[in-house]
Amino acid sequence: MSRSPIPSWCFAVAVVKLGRRFLVIRERKHGELWYLPAGRVELAESFAEAAVRETLEEAGLRIELEGILRIEHSPLPGEARFRVIFLARPADDTPPKSRPDEHSLEARWVTVEDLSTLRLRGREMTRLFEDVLAGAPVFPLSLLRPEGEPLLGRAS
């Protein structure tokens, strides 16, 4: 039986936490709604690299990834979608960007309670933030590895 390739879309999402606050960005697209730093994984880029890049582009912040909150696979008719949602912290004290550019309109730190005052892209952020604050499991970054990499890090 012949098999055709399945178009697959890969996305990286960053949940960036500072104390009890989280980083959100106001998107230029999607009706200027608030969401998390996120975007497509580019050719020859890892999910982790994409999360770091998207956060820098959309929020103006350098981050350090702490772990993985979720790995999602959504099979759809004719295609598939993969998303990796990372937990991260800011790498330094740089404030989020406040001027619009081609990537986003602005970024800010918010609490879960602040979300009710913003036009959100969906309820996902509220659930994620509440879960993180409640102690949701954070999986090691090593869970997501390049194909063929040894599990114990030994040379082949």
Regions found by a protein language model. Give the residues of each.
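Conserved N-terminal beta-strand and adjoining loop/helix that marks the start
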Residues: M1-F22, R40, I71
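Short secondary-structure boundary/capping segments
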Residues: I6, A14-V15, R26, L76, ...
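Unchanged
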Residues: V41-E64, S74-L128, L151-A155
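Conserved S-adenosyl-L-methionine
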Residues: E66-R70
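Short connector loops/turns at beta-strand edges and beta->alpha or beta->beta junctions
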Residues: R21, R28-G31
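Charged phosphate-binding loop/patch that engages nucleotide di/tri-phosphates or the phosphate backbone
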Residues: E130-S156
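Residue-level preference for beta-strand/loop junctions
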Residues: S8, E32, A80-F82
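A short gly/proline-enriched turn/hairpin at secondary-structure junctions
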Residues: Y35-A38
